């Protein structure tokens, strides 16, 4: 199971296709954001 857009992610919870796990200020944990691919 993968994490969708804006979902919390880490080493165990990976993002779905075309998403990348990043820290987005001001959020302190990492979330899945678009990696600009299609």
Swiss-Prot record:
GO molecular function: ion channel inhibitor activity; potassium channel regulator activity; toxin activity
Keyword entries, A-Z: Amidation, Disulfide bond, Ion channel impairing toxin, Knottin, Neurotoxin, Potassium channel impairing toxin, Secreted, Toxin, Voltage-gated potassium channel impairing toxin
Modified residues (Phenylalanine amide): 38
Pfam families: Toxin_12
InterPro entries assigned to the protein according to its UniProt record, in alphabetical order: Huwentoxin-1 (IPR011696)
Tissue expression: Expressed by the venom gland.
GO CC term, one of those recorded: extracellular region
Localization in the cell: Secreted
Disulphide linkage map: 2-16, 9-21, 15-32
Transmembrane residue ranges: none
Source organism superkingdom: Eukaryota
Function, as annotated: Inhibitor of voltage-gated potassium channels. It specifically inhibits Kv2.1/KCNB1 channels.
Additional comment: Negative results: only weakly inhibits Kv2.1/KCNB1 (18% current inhibition at 300 nM). Has no activity on Kv2.2/KCNB2, Kv4.1/KCND1, Kv4.2/KCND2 and Kv4.3/KCND3. In addition, intracerebroventricular injection into mice does not induce observable neurotoxicity symptoms.
Note on domains (UniProt): The presence of a 'disulfide through disulfide knot' structurally defines this protein as a knottin.
Family: Belongs to the neurotoxin 10 (Hwtx-1) family. 13 (Hntx-13) subfamily.
Protein's name according to its UniProt entry: Kappa-theraphotoxin-Hm2a
Organism: Heteroscodra maculata
